Amino acid sequence: MEQSIRSIDGSRSLSNVGASLIDRESINQRALQLLQRNRRRRLLLNRSEDKARYIQPERSASSQQIHPPEHHISAHERITKARGTRYKPTDLALAEIRKYQRSTDLLISRMPFARLVKEVTDQFTTESEPLRWQSMAIMALQEASEAYLVGLLEHTNLLALHAKRITIMRKDMQLARRIRGQFI
């Protein structure tokens, strides 16, 4: 492309630049024409499966039976096709676990957590001297609390697996806190 713009002596010539612009414009025009022609063709295609839904079959006087269309698709098949593939709950759970293990985002919403922190601190302070929180302090507290909860749930899951179960129960959580040396 650079070669077509330069003239024989190496300097740029406007005639070559103008020619390349005209070539680009003609290519764009041709592409637009092809696109419009394809759109018109798609609109003109016969859609027999759509017509079969709305056009009533012809009834002859000799027979009152209506034959169903040969390519009949049940409503259930249509719905499942529209939805796409359905995954097993275990596959969905594993995909969700992988998603959250990859991310480093906080899982508890910021505003409800901040309200909870302020509510708890209001119980331990007097009304005359309310305690104020910086946003960074609340974020640090949220990071620490989420790390604590994740660790506790990991230990709880290990205890459930040790009991040959995959469902965590209250007794697993209590035992995990007791082993850690925390109150039940």
Curated annotation (Swiss-Prot):
Biased composition (Basic and acidic residues): 68-80
Region (Disordered): 54-81
Posttranslational mods: Ubiquitinated. Is degraded through ubiquitin-mediated proteolysis when not protected by its association to the kinetochore.
Region (H3-like): 82-182
UniProt GO cellular component terms: CENP-A containing nucleosome; nucleus
Keyword Ubl conjugation: yes
Main location, first listed in the record: nucleus
GO molecular function, a single term: DNA binding
InterPro entries: Histone-fold, Histone_H2A/H2B/H3, Histone_H3/CENP-A
Subunit structure and binding partners: Component of centromeric nucleosomes, where DNA is wrapped around a histone octamer core. The octamer contains two molecules each of H2A, H2B, CSE4/CENPA and H4 assembled in one CSE4-H4 heterotetramer and two H2A-H2B heterodimers. Interacts with the inner kinetochore.
SMART domains named among the record's database cross-references: H3
Function: Histone H3-like nucleosomal protein that is specifically found in centromeric nucleosomes. Replaces conventional H3 in the nucleosome core of centromeric chromatin that serves as an assembly site for the inner kinetochore. Required for recruitment and assembly of kinetochore proteins, mitotic progression and chromosome segregation. May serve as an epigenetic mark that propagates centromere identity through replication and cell division.
Name of the protein: Histone H3-like centromeric protein CSE4
Cell compartment(s), UniProt: Nucleus; Chromosome, Centromere
PROSITE patterns assigned to the protein according to its UniProt record, in alphabetical order: HISTONE_H3_2 (PS00959)
Family according to the record: Belongs to the histone H3 family.
Alphabetical UniProt keywords: Centromere, Chromosome, DNA-binding, Nucleosome core, Nucleus, Ubl conjugation
Gene3D superfamilies attached to this UniProt entry: Histone, subunit A
Pfam families: Histone
Highest taxon in the source lineage: Eukaryota
Taxonomic source organism: Kluyveromyces lactis (strain ATCC 8585 / CBS 2359 / DSM 70799 / NBRC 1267 / NRRL Y-1140 / WM37) (Yeast)
